[in-house]
């Protein structure tokens, strides 16, 4: 769900980059490359392609509306990069041309990105955000 919320927040904001396999070490004030190798071993066929397919099916298809899933290449690009001899999943997210709600436990959730945080907004703040970003209540 955390990955889905981050992707939704980027879609509803100005886009952005999500790195899976990078961990923030708050005590040291830096990021640590941990890689996704263990997650890849748990994926369908234990390959990067299987990991990518798992991300798409279990996150994008599950939590996002068909307009995102059916036109994934318009909004999301998934690549794998080798950093410090570990594999990192790099998800590049473009800003959506209309609002995107996540469906979690039969509730519609609207996320935005503020600085380095994902935030849920609702009510009047949601309406104001939609008008600001897309010019209407689209």
List where the protein language model places each region:
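Conserved N-terminal catalytic/coupling substructures associated with nucleotide/phosphate chemistry
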Residues: 1-138
């Amino acid at each position: 769900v955390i990955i889905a919320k981050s992707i939704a927040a980027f879609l509803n904001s100005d886009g952005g980059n999500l790195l899976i396999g990078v961990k923030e070490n708050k005590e040291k004030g830096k990021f640590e490359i941990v890689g996704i190798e263990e997650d890849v071993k748990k994926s369908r066929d234990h390959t990067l392609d299987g990991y990518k397919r798992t991300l798409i099916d279990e996150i994008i298809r599950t939590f996002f509306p068909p307009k995102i899933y059916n036109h994934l290449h318009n909004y999301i690009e998934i690549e794998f990069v080798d950093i410090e001899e570990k594999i990192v999943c790099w998800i590049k997210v473009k800003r959506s041309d209309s609002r995107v709600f996540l469906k979690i436990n039969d509730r519609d959730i609207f996320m935005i990105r503020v600085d380095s945080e994902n935030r849920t907004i609702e009510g009047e703040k949601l309406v104001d955000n939609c008008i600001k970003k897309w010019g209407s209540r689209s």
